[in-house]
Amino acid sequence: MTLNELKDGQKAIIVNLNAHKELKNRLLSFGFIKNKNLKKIHSSLKNATIMVELDTSCVILRSDEAKTIEVNLI
């Protein structure tokens, strides 16, 4: 399952980042690391952007970026 498939309010753990090097480095700098818990807060209309809570931070990703983050529901 990928991050963009989560429903608003669902919690998950990051399993893998399936992104190219530049995007992977960007995601890592935001705190998207393997085995980290996250919560999907909100999706925009038509799922174009996704707001995610990581620890005490909120990050907004494009749908294409969220598709590269593999997660498991908690």
Swiss-Prot record:
One GO MF term attached to the UniProt entry: transition metal ion binding
Alphabetically ordered keywords of this record: Ion transport, Iron, Iron transport, Transport
Record-level GO BP terms: iron ion transport
Gene name of the record: feoA
A Pfam family per the record: FeoA
Name the UniProt record assigns to this protein: Putative Fe(2+) transport protein A
Domain of life, source organism: Bacteria
UniProt similarity note: Belongs to the FeoA family.
Originating organism: Campylobacter jejuni subsp. jejuni serotype O:2 (strain ATCC 700819 / NCTC 11168)
Stated role: Might be involved in Fe(2+) ion uptake.
Signals that turn on the gene: Detected in iron-restricted, mid-log-phase cells, part of the feoA-feoB operon (strain NCTC 11168).
